[in-house]
């Protein structure tokens, strides 16, 4: 049998499917998620139910968002899950997660995410950060390193700044390729993201922060002065106490917010 087949389902490359099969890893992830009935529990990409089943066992209802129609049909017919699942068939990148929030209950979101959409999906979920208690995701290890990176490191970039603006980021565990079917060509890791109730450095317009960080990191080897010359003058850099000769990966989240707020105030 092909190593891409698991429980009778053939993994689809276009959906980035790698199914988690290691029971020990599954138990550790479920322990980190800590399922409960006090939150709206939401799984993105439930696949063949490796996390879905143990999470649903301890709660009354689980909401899932799945793109693959074949997998949706399997979930609808699942003997123990079908009565507990609220299934949304569709693309998580376009899904309005705010519709899942119930009065007085925030979301806990989790999933073994398709690696080909993990970065854009992070940016999409940050839009709903105020309605989310926490998130636990299996990601490519490289992406977890980027999410949790410190200024001055190679992994530090636009994703780092936006993730750490919205959330506390905590790596949970590393997961080797043999924990999946089919085995991915990269190492994986689980990360916990906890959105701030009160942001340490509030930005007056998050879209401006996103635009500024994108512009700054477009040319990583160039200086801030070079990359942001159409947005911030040398005098303004000096007023903020920011060295304009530094490269974008040397600037803290707090400093990026300060620059974005300055640009907003000039409008």
Swiss-Prot record:
Where it sits in the cell: the answer is: Cytoplasm
State the reactions this protein catalyses: adenosine(1518)/adenosine(1519) in 16S rRNA + 4 S-adenosyl-L-methionine = N(6)-dimethyladenosine(1518)/N(6)-dimethyladenosine(1519) in 16S rRNA + 4 S-adenosyl-L-homocysteine + 4 H(+)
EC top class, as a word: transferase
- Record EC number: 2.1.1.182
Cellular component, GO annotation? cytosol
Q: Which UniProt keywords apply?
A: Cytoplasm, Methyltransferase, RNA-binding, rRNA processing, S-adenosyl-L-methionine, Transferase
Specify which residues bind S-adenosyl-L-methionine according to the UniProt entry for this protein.
Answer: 18, 20, 45, 66, 91, 112
Q: Does the keyword Transferase apply?
A: yes
List the molecular function annotations (GO) for this entry. 16S rRNA (adenine(1518)-N(6)/adenine(1519)-N(6))-dimethyltransferase activity; RNA binding
NCBIfam families on file: ksgA (TIGR00755)
- State the similarity comment: Belongs to the class I-like SAM-binding methyltransferase superfamily. rRNA adenine N(6)-methyltransferase family. RsmA subfamily.
User: Its function?
Assistant: Specifically dimethylates two adjacent adenosines (A1518 and A1519) in the loop of a conserved hairpin near the 3'-end of 16S rRNA in the 30S particle. May play a critical role in biogenesis of 30S subunits.
Give the protein name, as stated in the record. Answer: Ribosomal RNA small subunit methyltransferase A
Native species: Shewanella sediminis (strain HAW-EB3)
Could you read off the lineage of the organism from its UniProt record?
Answer: Bacteria, Pseudomonadati, Pseudomonadota, Gammaproteobacteria, Alteromonadales
